[in-house]
Regions:
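Residue-level recognition of the N-termini of beta-strands and the immediately preceding loop/turn
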Residues: 5, 49-53, 82-83, 190, ...
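Tryptophan-centric aromatic hotspots in well-structured domains and transmembrane helices
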Residues: 9, 32, 57, 128-131, ...
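Short, solvent-exposed loop/turn segments at secondary-structure junctions
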Residues: 12-16, 59-62, 90-92, 135-136, ...
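Mid-to-C-terminal alpha-helical segments outside catalytic/metal-binding sites
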Residues: 1, 5-6, 224-239, 246-286
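Active-site gating/metal-coordination segments in enzymes
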Residues: 20-136, 142-145, 158, 167-173, ...
Length: 286
């Protein structure tokens, strides 16, 4: 069995405020998560893991004006509940299979207004969850070097693409991906959140099957990604994640954690502790 003792909610553009300034509407999601956290605490005695915090959304393109949004997130929540911010910068250089990513600007992390907004995070001791795709990893490396005081969580292996013009090219893309994450790993302020490789955009095709993937299939196709990241970053800078509910298109929750346990089998007890708990506890301050 799996002993899930606590969870972190990561923004998903849900439950925004219906009124008020556009910039502050994402605070509604934080308010919603707080209400759910109270319910989860009530149910924790019955075996349901509590929500221990959240990663909220703020539009960093607001520049220094994003400070008002950050203050609103923090003021509506219990102290320490809001752990960080995710402003997705994922940009696909082709018409995507997933429509929500259309209309985004390329090179967002290089823009002065984005960087001005990003610079506000350290002031509030907030981390940054970086959701991007593999063609953007070098941009994130540059951002991490420019802001060493800000903790960055590298989400989902940097989104190795396997659809559109990248369909069927996983073997070709892997060495380039490895080269870029090797440089990123040299930034000590970057931590790796390992999971999210079973999304439709990764191109394994499990979402199109009648039966979801089993744990052995996941290990066979994903193990090299996991072992590469753990080798480069070290277990003390890596944490396993479920990326649910998005990964449920391809795999069940229990099966995914079974796969992660199989991947982690060669590591020591101390290293496993980092991968399954300690790194996440340190980074998200729980």
């Amino acid at each position: 069995g799996h002993n899930i003792v606590g969870t972190i909610f990561v923004e998903c553009s849900a439950e925004y405020r219906d009124s008020g300034p556009q910039s502050l509407k994402p605070v509604g999601e934080t308010e919603f998560v707080i209400s759910q956290a109270k319910l989860s605490n009530e149910k924790s005695s019955r075996g349901q893991p509590p929500i221990l915090g959240c990663v909220s959304h703020a539009n960093l393109m607001l520049g220094e004006k994003v400070q008002e949004v950050l203050e609103e997130h923090l003021s509506c929540a219990p102290k320490g509940f809001v752990k960080g911010i995710r402003h997705s910068v994922a940009y696909y250089p082709f018409p995507p299979k997933v429509g929500r990513y259309t209309g985004r600007l390329p090179g967002l992390m290089n823009r002065p207004d984005f960087r001005e907004g990003f610079s506000m995070l350290a002031k509030f001791q907030l981390s940054f969850d970086a959701w991007l795709v593999h063609t953007q990893i070098t941009e994130l490396t540059d951002l991490a070097r420019k802001f060493p005081e800000t903790t960055i969580i590298f989400d989902h292996f940097g989104g190795p693409l396997g659809i559109g013009s990248f369909s069927g090219r996983q073997t070709e893309i892997f060495p380039l991906w490895k080269k870029h994450v090797t440089e990123l790993s040299k930034c000590e302020n970057v931590y790796a959140k390992l999971g999210g490789l079973a999304m439709p955009l990764n191109g394994w095709g499990w979402d199109l099957r009648e039966r979801p993937a089993n744990s052995d299939e996941i290990v066979t196709l994903h193990k090299d990604y996991y072992l590469t990241m753990i080798d480069l970053f070290g277990p003390n800078r890596c944490m396993f994640e479920s990326n649910f509910p998005v990964d449920k298109f391809s795999v069940s929750y229990n099966v995914l954690w079974n796969a992660l346990k199989k991947i982690a089998e060669p590591f020591s007890i101390e290293e496993k502790s980092c991968l399954f708990k300690e790194t996440a506890s340190k980074v998200y301050k729980i």
